Curated annotation (Swiss-Prot):
Membrane-traversing stretches: none
Record comment regarding domains: The presence of a 'disulfide through disulfide knot' structurally defines this protein as a knottin.
Protein name stated in the entry: Cyclotide psybry A
Function in brief: Probably participates in a plant defense mechanism.
Keyword Disulfide bond: yes
Site of covalent link Cyclopeptide (Gly-Asn): G1-N31
Length: 31
């Protein structure tokens, strides 16, 4: 499960990498 966005959003509800969004599983994924 490689995460190309390099972030999770369990503690912070935002993703800082461009083109990434928070998934239901609290992982930043490409949108």
């Amino acid at each position: 499960g490689f995460n190309p966005c390099g972030e999770t959003c369990i503690w912070f509800p935002t993703c800082h990498a461009p083109g990434c969004t928070c998934s239901i599983a609290n992982i930043c994924v490409r949108n």
